[in-house]
Amino acid sequence: MGLVMNKRKYIFPLAVAAFGLWACGEDNNSTTACVTEQCLIDQYGEFNADSANKAMEDSILAAQGGSSSSSWTVYSAERPDPLEAGHEMELGESSSSGAEVTCGPQTPWACVSSSSLILPDASSSSHRHPTSSSSVDVPPVSSSSVVVVPPTPANDFVEDHRSECQIGNIPTSVNNAKLPDPFKGLDGKRISTKDEWKCRREEIGAMYEKLMFGTKPRNPEKVEGSYSGGKLTIKVTDKGKSGSFSVKISNAGTKDKPKPAMIGFGGGMMGGCGSLGNATNGLDIAQITFNPDDVAPESGGGMFFQLYNQGQGTIIAWAWGVSRIIDALEKTPEAGIDVKHLAMTGCSRWGKGTLAVGAFDERIALTIPQESGSGGASLWRVGAQVNRQKGKQFVQGLNSAGTEGKWMISSFKNYDGKENTLPFDQHILVAMVAPRALLILDNAGQEWLGEVPSNDCGQASKEVYDALGATENYTYSQEGGHGHCQLPNGQFDEVKDFMNKFLLGKDAKTGKIVYTKNTEQINWKKSDWIDWETPNLN
């Protein structure tokens, strides 16, 4: 297998399968389906979605006197799957043809009583990120909607899985002019399953921490949150030291009705560098403003380095700060934030930080780095080639990016001019976000951002999403003709689609490579940079 798991966590959600009384007509006898964990185990030998669906079939058949054929499926092909993200079922809802839906074996979702549902904790939605391993999307249940909720493994809502994985020896140098294989483990063996990706991405993270970013401290002794007047204060205590910082929250929900949220560096959606501007109009989500200078200013010092003075770069310190925000939100439901539906955005240097946040914290459901350039979603090897061809630093090079803003550890600049010796390239950092949702926004009109290395990174990163069967969770969008960090109208649709789909659970088309106004599709020659096969991970 190549990658070793020390342990496995299969945690089932508190919301177990619940199927309503058989009530197609007033004169029918009522039969209650087996809905408890123990009942499913006793009668069907297991507690999972298959046993829950079998219990529902048996309940409906029993109510019909066992006369129905066993060939019908639980979810009718003529009706949207009630587990499909964003589809909340109403009792008495009409079919697509406009006819009233009748309770029956082809329409079991019409037979469910809201009183029979075992609801999740009201403080947060219980459903998980799309395309995470071994589960399905379960839309939130409101008092006016009915959803069949089979018992499935819950989302491992954790920062990462580093403690579960054995990390091998990390090379400091290779000889490879091509893009490193994201599927080859440190032991030289390629992964073949989606489950193995969990530890492969941890290997990648460990490489980045050792060679580029510095160590991201994990599991501080205590994280506390307090919320008042639209401000969340986060206090972190670790190894005998304490520090605190605050973030602003606007358009928040309530403890009983929390809202999805976008965390924005330096203002994010609300203005400043990284603004998504009017693209977010009409979307009922909360906005969390995080000033990274409150944790680790680029000038040096700051709360993070008072707690951990280990030579890290500021980018990993910013990522640590966002992780502590999420910790505090989990413990502060009165802030009105649905922590299971968090997005992260930022532009330029904060775009680099955004990518690091999404890569190093699996609790981020949607990552939107904007115009991140070198050190973000842009390939070091391709950028170096472009500069050699131009005979000058046309694209920001490794030495410049490696020293500006103290983003990276000081030794990383030693790879300048030796990019082919890097054991990784940025397509692998991008891949760490997979299979969670990722929208990369790029600007073809700013030379130093690197139109070609950014495009090629977008193309190469897609290989991992394809391998994981998560193509629809990934979009790379490039447009020119606008200023740096000024989101153009041509990219509004991508932003809205991703937010609607991955934060609000609505139907939207995602999963594409997009070239819009004032840019041309770049000739991506895969064979020039990739000498490995993309597996179909099962």
Where do the model's predicted regions map?
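Loop/turn elements at helix/coil->beta-strand transitions in domains of secreted/extracellular proteins
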Residues: K257-M262, G282-Q287, V339-H341, E362-L366, ...
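Primarily recognizes the serine-hydrolase "nucleophile elbow" in alpha/beta-hydrolase
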Residues: I325-K390, K418-E419
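Bacterial Sec-dependent N-terminal signal peptides
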Residues: K7-R8, L14, G20-G104, C111-A122, ...
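N-terminal secretory signal peptides that target proteins for export/translocation
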Residues: M1-K7
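Alpha/beta-hydrolase-fold serine-hydrolase catalytic core, especially in secreted/extracellular enzymes
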Residues: V149-S246, N251-K257, A434-L438, N443-N538
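Mobile cap/lid helix-loop segments that gate and shape the active-site cleft of serine hydrolases
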Residues: P369-L429, G450-G458, V464-T471
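Flexible loop/turn segments at secondary-structure boundaries
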Residues: M270-G272, V295-P297, G351-G353, S374-L379, ...
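Cap/lid segment of the alpha/beta-hydrolase catalytic domain
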Residues: I263-P333, G373-Q385
